[in-house]
Every structure is written in C-alpha cells, then in structure tokens.
Design a protein with these regions (language model features):
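Catalytic cores of extracellular degradative/oxidative enzymes
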Residues: 1-127
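Flexible domain-boundary/linker segments
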Residues: 68-70, 139, 201
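Polar/charged alpha-helical tracts
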Residues: 4, 14, 18, 90, ...
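Residue-identity detector for glycine
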Residues: 8-9, 36, 43-48, 65, ...
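Beta/coil-rich, acidic/histidine-enriched accessory regions frequently appended to metallopeptidases
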Residues: 156-255
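Active-site-proximal alpha-helical
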Residues: 82-196
Length: 255
C-alpha cells in the first residue's frame, strides 16, 4: 500500500471483488471490527474496542444464516467464545466474584477491549428479545444524532435526566420493552444511580423480565465450581490449553 499513490477511487481490495473461490465470510472479523469503528457507535464506558466487533454477528446470522453461537464466536479471530463461554470468562474473574464492575482501565487488566465478554450483553439482548430490539435502539440513536438531539453526547447528564450509563440502560430497556438493568448489571456495567434509573424504568411502564431472570439463573448454573470445570472451560476456548501468553489477558490469563 502506497498512501501517495493516486487511485481516483479505484483502489483494488479483496473485499471489493467477487473472488473465486469466494472468501469465507467467517474470516472477515478484522474488516468488520474496523468497519464497526467507522459506524461511530456510542457505547458504555470501556466498550470502544469491544462493541465494534458485534455488528459482524448480525451480518453472519441475518445475511449468511450462521447460527447465533457460531456467529458470535467468529466476531473476533483470536478467541473462541460462545455467549455462554463469555459469561463463564466473566464469572471466573475476581471482579465478578467481588461484585465489582468489569475493568475498563484501558490497561492489560482491561476486561472489555478486544474481548467477547465486553460486548456479550448485546448478544444476550438479541437472543432474548430478537434483533429488532437492537435495531430499534440503534435506529433511534442514529435518528436523534442526525437531528442534533442525541440523548447523550459528551454530556455528563443526559436529556432524560440520567447520567450516561444509566441513560443507555434505560434507552436499551425501552427498545427491548423490558427492564434490562439486571442483565446489563450481570455483564459488569452497574448503574451509577440505581434509584433514578429504577424510577425512570417504572415511569416508562417497563416490567421485570422472567426470561432475563431465567437466563441469569442459567448462568449461575454453568459457572465453574472447581478446577476440573475451570480446565474444561479452558480447553473449550483454547484447545490444548497452551502454556504461553501474557498473564493478564488471553490464553496466558488462564495459566
């Protein structure tokens, strides 16, 4: 690639061509990660290098008919987590056990960036409430942005009177038609003002969800409770349990 080369808009790239044989869409993770950045999606604090992977899951599932678990697995090329595996990956951390939010320090200890547990909450919303719930949410975000009335944009307090994280939980809940607070809390994003958020949820007529309750009970049942179960999970996401890597993340964290 030569940045000084004049292409007149005709730069040849593999993803612009009808390749023969066609490139397997399951291996487009990096391209869709960068395309995700280009969408300028807002997210919870710390999701910047996480949520951008998620639209690829929608494309694989809706466009190519890939089942939800496989579609989610293929959203990154360096790991092999289903949503259930991502839940386990989060539940076996000290932060989860101690009731803390997911680490978003942008250090090697960060538990969001480039990791499927960092955006699995959206996969759960899609699995429990359908893709339309997320389509409703992001469509409204786009409409509001274009109209210059985005609920939260570089403001500590949003137009709905809630702080940013709480407002996003509230808006996602409205799009899904149910109170998503417990689900999002499970995934390590805690309300800043739970009282104000609960009042907004109630005022909007959003109820507690039995399917969320059932999902959280299910997650409690798959959390490893001993070393053998931990190693079974390790083998699932990193076959062969390789003994290398940085101790703060990836395969090295498991060692």
């Amino acid at each position: 690639y030569n940045p000084l080369e004049e292409t007149n808009g005709n730069q040849v790239a593999w993803f612009l061509l009808n390749q023969t044989p066609p490139r397997n869409p399951l291996f487009w993770a990096t391209e869709f990660h960068e395309l995700g950045h280009a969408q300028l999606m807002q997210g919870f604090w710390g999701e910047g290098e996480a949520i951008v992977n998620f639209p690829f899951s929608y494309v694989l599932n809706e466009k190519f008919g890939v089942d939800n678990d496989t579609a989610f697995q293929k959203t990154v090329s360096h790991a092999n987590y289903t949503v259930d595996d991502a839940a386990i990956h989060w539940m076996i951390t000290e932060n989860f056990r101690n009731g803390n939010p997911m680490d978003n320090s942008n250090t090697t200890l960060d538990e969001f960036r480039y990791q499927q547990r960092g955006y699995a909450k959206y996969a759960d919303i899609a699995r429990l409430f359908g893709w339309q719930a997320l389509k409703n949410f992001f469509y409204q975000e786009n409409v509001d942005f274009n109209a210059g009335t985005l609920t939260c944009f570089e403001e500590a307090v949003c137009r709905d009177g809630l702080v940013q994280a709480d407002s996003r939980i509230f808006r996602l809940s409205k799009a899904a038609g149910a109170d998503l607070t417990p689900l999002i809390h499970f995934w390590g994003v805690h309300p800043d003002n739970s009282t104000a958020l609960a009042q907004a949820i109630t005022a909007a007529g959003l109820d507690n969800s039995t399917i969320i309750r059932d999902k959280l009970v299910y997650y409690a049942g798959i959390a490893p409770t001993n070393n053998a179960q931990f190693n079974t999970h390790f083998e699932t996401v990193f076959p062969g349990r390789p003994a290398y890597g940085h101790p703060d993340y990836g395969v090295g964290w498991y060692n």
